């Protein structure tokens, strides 16, 4: 690490897996990575072909949007345009198990959202995920299961069809299994109730 780098060192096998995942993403492939909620399926979120590959692996309808994961909030604002209130919310809850819906810039392709100008932003509270995002991000943030099937909490649960379709799998410990809460701060609407939802509701009420 560079002097002043605040990243936590990873054990050697995990670092090797992370390096393979970065190489795979840069080659246009998808990878499986751990987060604080469930295992995610990540690919270069700025590359329409890579995004399309994620949809294919998950067998996900193209009209269902994908969220995007970033290494930190400043990185996220390079690709999105949050309002002051949305940014205040992000600084309160990110990194964390929350997906915040904000306006996207054109550097994020329409395929991610089926043309919707708004997109979900994640900054995972997981060191492996953060290092992956910083090295290869922004990357897609969607669960590493096929659509309609249970989320993946540990590597042993990963469907073989997904494992065979990705360029790398970063195997780590079992995750919490609770999905992120999806919130549109501009309207105060919670689209999916998940982790930290009570604190989010309190923030929305207090800042209304």
Regions found by a protein language model. Give the residues of each.
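Active-site-adjacent structural elements in enzyme catalytic cores
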Residues: 1-208
């Amino acid at each position: 690490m560079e002097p002043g780098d605040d990243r936590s060192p990873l054990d050697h096998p995990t670092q090797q897996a992370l390096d393979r995942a970065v190489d795979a993403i840069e080659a246009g492939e998808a990878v499986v990575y751990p987060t604080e909620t469930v295992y995610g399926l990540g690919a270069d979120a700025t590359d329409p072909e890579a995004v399309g590959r994620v949809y294919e692996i998950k067998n996900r309808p193209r009209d269902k949007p994908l969220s995007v994961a970033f290494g930190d909030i400043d990185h996220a604002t390079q690709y999105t345009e949050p309002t002051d209130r949305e940014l205040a919310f992000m600084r309160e809850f990110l990194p964390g198990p929350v997906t915040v819906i904000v306006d996207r810039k054109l550097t994020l392709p329409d395929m991610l959202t089926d043309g919707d100008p708004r997109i979900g932003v994640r900054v995972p509270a997981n060191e492996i995920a953060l290092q992956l995002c910083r090295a290869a991000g922004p990357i897609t943030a969607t669960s590493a299961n096929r659509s309609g099937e249970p989320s993946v909490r540990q590597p042993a649960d990963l469907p073989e069809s997904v494992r065979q379709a990705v360029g790398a799998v970063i195997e780590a410990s079992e995750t919490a299994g609770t999905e992120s809460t999806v919130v549109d701060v501009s309207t105060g609407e919670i689209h999916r109730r998940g982790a930290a939802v009570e604190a989010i509701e309190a923030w929305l009420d207090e800042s209304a």
